[in-house]
């Protein structure tokens, strides 16, 4: 396995620490000579055919990236067919970038979101202009091919915008027309369109398919950019595999090749390794111009330096150009760059060689403190608090950004730069270089690819590659596919058994129609969950499109093809079971037509749902739209509302409904040219035994008097207006829909991008604004500190910090987890302690187990076995330990809708001891805000990255949330400076120093400390790979104690100017390119320092244990206050009140969620109501009113799909941050989330009632009974119960599942069963005996029965013209006389009672008779309502029970734990930092 630490980027020569003194000098010299000779002998070799173990073998330990690059370049140069290498420099002049909007925004809520709509309307009016916000002001610069530019500036200074502009990604902002960009003769338009993948921007976030392995992810990227002709005689797949191996070796991730990448919720590689995968993927684009935005975030300093060295090597050998923003740049990283750009609030204050940048500001009157890196010094110019002014120069130096920019514009350095830019523009003004660039690009592209296309592969090649990746993704995670197949098979079996062996007579007519209706719906609408999958991958696909790896539409087309086998298999299994179990038409042609129509309907509706997902930008937008369309497609299929009953205003819907055409074809396929014996004649029974056939008629629609059968064609034509001549015509129409929707889907994937953030803006609640302690001008006028200034005095705010006395110690701590069948040790016998008033650093390479150790000490592991001894004041930890410690996690996880003050107050109220008055807790929060300098944005909304708090503000809030809890024991911080610039990191350490001086005990992991930052720590716990201790002890002034230990044990001396934090990594062989033969773990265990640690641990244990026992003895009791030892500080009632208030507040501030629910409920109700507007009380009219209820229930699936993703987001926050901190219990979390839906569902039920009940006209049925008000109230209660049931059912489903998709599959299965067995599609007497229990347990049975009873009971029925049965009475009788006996027994009425021929008989005279046919009774209304509440309560209780059983960790943390909740944990799973 190739390790990142073993990669040699400098021709195989070692830059690591020397061997111990005992090593023979001659052996070193011989080894050096051998390495040089082997390096010089490989340049003529083919790198694809390198000898195993040579410097060109990426899978060997001797791999040299520099040697490989040179050999590859030589191979390309010697091959005439290879594309000539491309280079791309850039010159920019007067670069101005602006956006539109405001520096601050207000938070949208349910109450004020309409103000935004009014604002948008006002902006659309003529003469109204948006406010212009300048982002970059007049930048000039030149980065030639083969040069590297480092961009420095604090967050918000415009670094990201500059890099995006250079890479041609200008979404959301605009470049002024007067700006000039020259890419060696190409314009910005050329770069953005024709050469998109030649200039790439890599963001600092890591977005990948989590289930794919690292090797497959990088092979895909290499294959997508593989040139047409490959030198060296290898195939394109061999080329891609080799490039993958090389790039993995370069970035030290070869050992992760077969490990899935993972993400925050799926276990995979460590965070640092995932960052390197992102870097490697971008590098494989082979772009000649690369823009890297803080890509070293999450890497330790050694790997950050190695990243910069790799870019340097690529620039030297391949002439690539790199622009890199770095927030924390070690000196060794900074020295790799040629030029530096310093930005100060969007203004350029320096551009030029890195070697002279420092001197430029020194000459201006500033001073650089000792051991401060050049990059930190340059960035400090943008911070009035950090820049140091030389005594006597206070009035000469610039103070504000504008003054710095003006000083730059008047400088000789800028004049030289402008001259260089002018020469560059003149050099590339004739277009020759652009033509050469285009020719080189063309030589790399596939032959059939368009010349102007930014993509390398042809469209068909892209589809093939995406198909391969789709297959890998399916293999890696087949759970959704398998669960869908399983679920549909179960539904087919249930549906088949429900309609088992239908009779071949007229008694099965309605059942056959209902069966075909439900079958076509399940086939057509089963693809609805594809929307969730598409949204999950959208960000990844768009990133790859920016890298010009493939068209988004090619991935879309490939995913369609990839789903085909599943769709074919699903169609065959489902329809085969259904068709033959139910005794549908037993003819081969009819069966295969049935199969074929359902298959093309599945494909068509798949395109439909994919189109909705691609045309919308968020899932919240997509779900209501999908719900309305599904409702329309279902209602206008022709079964729920026959054609003759469709109202004129909506009749056109059936012509754009592919399901309508499919249903018609299936109905005529089943009924055409078949005669069905009649089983029910009118009149019949006692007194009618001897009448002739002409005196009675079959009771089925389409019958003819005197015939003992009903013709199938007559039936479907009379009832549905269907004809057999439309059978194949409809198939053609469905095909047209499928092709049309497919093109809509493919076009939408190319044209409509995912919603992106607006940029970093503060968001306040409406009516609130920023508070500033002092004016902006005052801050800038301060100009910086002087050398003579005394260190500023500590704030009185320190007095508020809880002074600690307890000592936390640990000895022989080990942590083992099970990987497969083997146990893997993550932590290996670690010792240490943290005392009050000390700041201890926990350091080590990525994967050394730093975060795992924090989790183990803080009792936050969710799996594995912890052994060893962890004590607090000599005693074992109790249940209250977790809430008495503060743990600031690396990920800044907060509720996005809360304000800063609210987040701090929530933590304080629930985590501080219960005996502290609430007002005192609130006052304490105000003091914490002052201490953390958050007053300016204390009332700002946290938001999401980009729209809300910036990185620094989030980090301060993360620390503040823990301080607000007043941790009594210890403060853990995991990477508090990760992603921050050096000045902000310094301010965070200032804060930690304040806390330390007031007695706070702090243990802090840190990745990239500068020498000055490192010096601020008192003690160091240093780990190596495998979780083994290398050193634990004091750091000492100028790190002399630490340095002395390593030098004394064989390490090379530390140069005076070196950063000890980087030097010690090199000494232990953990830095890339370094090597050591010393086993530093064994050295530590044998050292006198280790012995002293063991002695002191024993002393601490005895001393602190005795003091604790003495204190307890003096108090006269073992536990003075039981509340101090409880698991949670606040009692359950207080937890529930606080959490309930916050959850309700969150929904109020999530208007998209509430209004999407409102739109779904209101529009669905209106659509159903007006589609069946004032439905008459005919037989079919009663059926329509029944189906209006049934159709209203079909939004159930969309209701639960809205709730489940929302719940998952809340659960992740709770399980990752709030549950481990013991902020509140899982019971409060579950109950609050269930109860918060109640008021909104109450409101929705009222809206649904008004929008549906009155348009359908059900109130008219209550008028004859004088109970209009009562029955209206009863109907509202049932709708209310339906929405409450939907909400609690959604929580019941998602409680145990990790993803909304899997919960949705299970929910859909149960939902379909509820619909099947509710008595609408088949009455209870038609069920096989086995299934009658399902009718009784289906909640929809009581819902439909109750609503139908309330809506239809106790009124008259008047038959429609086609519902009257026509026959002649016996001779000598009137129609009334002839039907009297039958009517008395069976009901009904005669329209023309006095007639003696052609009697018109309606078989039903009141709605109660109709209710009896569907087993509904108005007398059961209150019983049914009560049963619905039983189901609601059951759902809520079951949701809580399931959550406890599956996701709540149980037992001691020191024992083997369940993996419940592990998917939500962001840390510890991998045992990596």
Swiss-Prot record:
Membrane topology listed for this record: Multi-pass membrane protein
Matches recorded under SUPFAM superfamilies: P-loop containing nucleoside triphosphate hydrolases (SSF52540)
Residues that span the membrane, as ranges: 480-500, 514-534, 560-580, 589-609, 622-642, 733-753, 1153-1173, 1189-1209, 1234-1254, 1277-1297, 1312-1332, 1425-1445
Record GO terms (molecular function): ABC-type transporter activity; ATP binding; ATP hydrolysis activity
InterPro entries for this protein: AAA+_ATPase, ABC2_TM, ABC_trans_N, ABC_transporter-like_ATP-bd, ABC_transporter-like_CS, ABCG_dom, ABCG_PDR_1, ABCG_PDR_2
Tree of life domain: Eukaryota
Ranges where the ABC transporter domain occurs: 115-370, 808-1050
Entry GO CC: plasma membrane
Glycosylation, residue list: 62, 294, 319, 1371, 1470
UniProtKB keywords: ATP-binding, Cell membrane, Glycoprotein, Membrane, Nucleotide-binding, Transmembrane, Transmembrane helix, Transport
Binding site for ATP: 844-851
Location(s) in or outside the cell: Cell membrane
Record Gene3D superfamilies: P-loop containing nucleotide triphosphate hydrolases
Similarity comment: Belongs to the ABC transporter superfamily. ABCG family. PDR (TC 3.A.1.205) subfamily.
Job of this protein: ABC-type transporter; part of the gene cluster that mediates the biosynthesis of the sesterterpenes ophiobolins, fungal phytotoxins with potential anti-cancer activities. Acts as a specific transporter involved in ophiobolins secretion.
PANTHER family: ATP-BINDING CASSETTE TRANSPORTER
Protein name: ABC-type transporter oblD
């Amino acid at each position: 396995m190739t390790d990142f630490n073993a990669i040699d980027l400098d021709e195989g020569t070692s830059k690591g620490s020397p061997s111990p003194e005992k090593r023979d000098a001659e052996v070193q010299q011989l080894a050096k000579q051998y390495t040089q000779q082997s390096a010089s002998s490989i340049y003529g070799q083919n790198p694809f055919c390198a000898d195993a173990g040579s410097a060109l073998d990426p899978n060997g330990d001797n791999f040299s990236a520099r040697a490989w690059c040179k050999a590859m370049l030589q191979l390309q140069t010697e091959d005439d067919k290879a594309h000539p290498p491309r280079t791309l420099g850039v010159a920019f002049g007067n670069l101005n970038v602006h956006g539109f909007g405001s520096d601050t925004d207000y938070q949208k809520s349910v109450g004020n979101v309409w103000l935004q709509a009014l604002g948008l309307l006002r902006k659309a009016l003529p003469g109204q202009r948006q406010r212009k916000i300048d982002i970059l002001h007049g930048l000039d610069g030149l980065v030639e091919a083969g040069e590297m530019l480092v961009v420095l500036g604090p967050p918000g200074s415009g670094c990201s915008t500059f890099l995006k502009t250079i890479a041609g990604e200008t979404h959301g902002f605009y470049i002024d027309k007067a700006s000039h960009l020259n890419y060696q003769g190409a314009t910005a338009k050329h770069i953005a369109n024709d050469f998109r993948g030649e200039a790439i921007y890599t963001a600092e976030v890591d977005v990948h398919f989590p289930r794919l392995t690292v090797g497959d992810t990088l092979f895909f990227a290499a294959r997508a950019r593989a040139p047409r002709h490959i030198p060296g005689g290898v195939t394109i797949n061999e080329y891609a595999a080799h490039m993958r191996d090389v790039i993995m070796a370069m970035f030290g991730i070869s050992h992760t090749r077969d490990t899935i990448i993972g993400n925050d919720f799926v276990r995979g590689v460590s965070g640092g390794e995932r960052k390197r995968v992102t870097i490697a993927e971008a590098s494989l684009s082979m772009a000649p111009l690369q823009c890297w935005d803080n890509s070293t975030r999450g890497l330790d300093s050694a790997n950050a330096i190695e990243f910069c060295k790799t870019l340097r090597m690529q620039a030297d050998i391949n002439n690539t150009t790199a622009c890199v923003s770095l927030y924390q740049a070690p000196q060794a990283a900074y020295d790799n760059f040629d030029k530096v750009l310093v930005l100060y609030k969007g203004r350029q204050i320096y551009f030029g060689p890195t070697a002279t940048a420092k001197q430029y500001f020194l000459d201006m009157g500033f001073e650089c403190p000792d051991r401060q890196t050049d990059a930190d010094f340059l960035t400090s110019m943008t911070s009035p608090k950090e820049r140091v002014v030389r005594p006597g120069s206070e009035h000469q130096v610039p103070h504000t950004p504008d003054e710095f920019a003006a000083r730059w514009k008047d400088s000789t350095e800028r004049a030289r730069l402008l001259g260089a830019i002018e020469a560059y523009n003149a050099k590339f003004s004739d277009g020759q270089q652009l033509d050469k660039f285009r020719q080189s690009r063309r030589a790399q592209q596939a032959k059939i690819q368009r010349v102007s296309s930014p993509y390398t592969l042809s469209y068909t090649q892209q589809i093939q590659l995406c198909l391969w990746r789709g297959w890998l993704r399916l293999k890696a995670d087949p759970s959704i596919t398998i669960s869908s197949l399983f679920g549909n098979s179960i539904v087919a079996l249930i549906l088949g058994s429900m309609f088992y062996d239908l009779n071949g007579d007229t008694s099965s007519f309605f059942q056959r129609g209902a069966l075909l209706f439900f079958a076509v719906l399940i086939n057509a609408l089963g693809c609805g969950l594809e929307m969730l999958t598409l949204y999950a991958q959208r960000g990844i696909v768009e990133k790859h499109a920016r890298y010009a790896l493939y068209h988004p539409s090619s991935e879309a087309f490939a995913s369609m093809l990839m789903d085909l086998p599943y769709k074919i298999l699903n169609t065959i299994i489902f329809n085969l079971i259904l068709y033959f179990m139910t005794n549908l038409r037993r003819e081969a042609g009819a069966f295969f037509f049935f199969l074929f129509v359902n298959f093309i309907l599945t494909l068509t509706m798949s395109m439909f749902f994919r189109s909705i997902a691609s045309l919308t930008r968020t899932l919240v937008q997509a779900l209501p739209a999908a719900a309305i369309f599904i409702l329309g497609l279902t209602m206008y299929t022709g079964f729920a509302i026959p054609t003759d009953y469709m109202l004129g205003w909506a009749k056109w819907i059936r012509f754009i409904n592919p399901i309508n055409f499919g249903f018609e074809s299936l109905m005529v396929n089943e009924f055409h040219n078949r005669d069905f014996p009649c089983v029910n004649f009118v009149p019949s029974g006692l007194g009618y035994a001897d009448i002739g056939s002409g005196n009675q008629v079959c009771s089925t629609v389409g019958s003819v008097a005197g015939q003992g059968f009903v013709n199938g064609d007559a039936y479907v034509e009379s009832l549905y207006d269907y004809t057999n001549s439309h059978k194949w015509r409809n198939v053609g129409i469905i095909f047209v829909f499928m092709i049309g929707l497919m093109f809509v889907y493919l076009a939408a994937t190319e044209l409509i991008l995912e919603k992106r953030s607006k940029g970093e803006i503060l968001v306040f609640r409406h009516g609130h604004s920023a508070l500033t302690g002092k004016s902006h001008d005052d801050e800038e006028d301060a100009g910086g500190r002087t050398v003579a200034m005394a260190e500023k005095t500590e704030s009185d705010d320190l007095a508020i910090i809880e002074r600690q006395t307890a000592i936390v110690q640990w000895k022989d701590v080990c942590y083992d987890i099970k990987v497969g069948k083997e146990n893997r040790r993550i932590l290996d016998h670690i010792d240490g302690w943290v005392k009050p008033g000390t700041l201890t650093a926990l350091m080590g390479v990525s994967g050394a187990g730093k975060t795992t150790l924090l989790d183990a000490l803080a009792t936050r592991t969710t799996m594995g076995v912890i052994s060893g001894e962890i004590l607090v004041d000599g005693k074992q930890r109790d249940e209250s330990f977790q809430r008495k410690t503060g743990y600031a996690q690396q990920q800044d996880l907060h509720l996005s809708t809360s304000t800063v003050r609210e987040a701090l107050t929530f933590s304080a109220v629930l985590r501080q001891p219960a005996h502290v008055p609430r007002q005192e807790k609130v006052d304490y929060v105000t003091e914490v805000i002052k201490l953390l300098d958050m007053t300016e944005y204390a009332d700002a909304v946290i938001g999401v990255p980009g729209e809300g708090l910036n990185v620094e503000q989030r980090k301060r809030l993360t620390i503040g949330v823990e301080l607000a809890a007043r941790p009594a024991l210890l403060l853990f911080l995991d990477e508090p400076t990760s992603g921050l610039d050096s000045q902000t990191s310094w301010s965070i350490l200032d804060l930690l120093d304040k806390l330390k001086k007031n007695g706070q005990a702090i243990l802090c992991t840190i990745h990239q400390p500068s020498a000055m930052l490192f010096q601020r720590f008192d003690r160091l716990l240093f780990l190596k790979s495998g979780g083994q201790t290398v050193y634990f002890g004091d750091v000492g002034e100028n790190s002399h104690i630490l340095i002395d230990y390593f030098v004394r044990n064989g390490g090379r001396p530390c140069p005076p100017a070196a950063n000890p934090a980087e030097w010690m990594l090199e000494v232990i062989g953990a830095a890339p390119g370094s090597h050591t033969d010393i086993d530093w773990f064994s050295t530590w265990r044998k050292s006198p320092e280790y012995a002293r640690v063991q002695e002191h641990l024993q002393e601490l244990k005895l001393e602190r244990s005795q003091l604790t026992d003495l204190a307890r003895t003096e108090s006269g009791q073992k536990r003075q206050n039981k509340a101090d030892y409880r698991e949670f500080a606040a009692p359950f009632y207080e937890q529930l009140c606080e959490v309930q208030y916050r959850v309700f507040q969150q929904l109020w501030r999530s208007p998209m969620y509430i209004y999407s629910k409102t739109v779904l409920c209101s529009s669905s109700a209106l659509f159903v109501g007006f589609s069946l507007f004032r439905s008459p009380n005919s037989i079919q009219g009663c059926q329509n009113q029944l189906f209006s209820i049934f159709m209203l229930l079909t939004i159930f699936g969309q209701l639960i799909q809205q709730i489940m993703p929302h719940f998952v987001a809340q659960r992740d926050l709770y399980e990752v941050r709030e549950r481990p901190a013991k902020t509140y219990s899982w019971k409060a979390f579950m109950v609050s989330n269930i109860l918060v839906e109640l008021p909104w569902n109450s409101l929705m039920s009222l809206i649904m009632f008004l929008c549906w009940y009155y348009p359908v006209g059900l109130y008219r049925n209550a008028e004859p009974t004088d109970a209009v008000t009562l029955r209206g109230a009863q109907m509202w209660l049932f709708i209310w119960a339906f929405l409450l049931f939907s909400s609690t059912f959604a929580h019941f489903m998602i409680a145990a599942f990790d993803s909304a998709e899997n919960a949705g599959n299970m929910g859909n299965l149960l939902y379909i069963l509820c619909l099947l067995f509710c008595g609408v599609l088949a009455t209870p007497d038609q069920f096989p005996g086995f299934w009658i229990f399902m009718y009784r347990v289906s909640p929809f049975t009581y819902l439909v029965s109750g609503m139908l009873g309330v809506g239809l009971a106790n009124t008259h029925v008047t038959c429609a013209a086609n519902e009257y049965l026509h026959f002649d009475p016996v001779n000598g009788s009137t129609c009334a006389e002839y039907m009297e006996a039958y009517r008395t027994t069976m009901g009904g009425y005669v329209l023309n009672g006095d007639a003696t021929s052609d009697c018109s008989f309606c078989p039903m005279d009141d709605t109660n008779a109709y209710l009896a046919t569907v087993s509904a009774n108005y007398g059961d209304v209150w019983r049914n309502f009560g049963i619905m509440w039983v189901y609601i309560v059951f759902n809520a209780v079951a949701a809580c029970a399931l959550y406890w059983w599956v996701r709540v960790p149980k037992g001691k943390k020191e024992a083997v734990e369940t993996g419940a909740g592990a998917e939500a944990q962001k840390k510890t799973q991998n045992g990596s930092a």
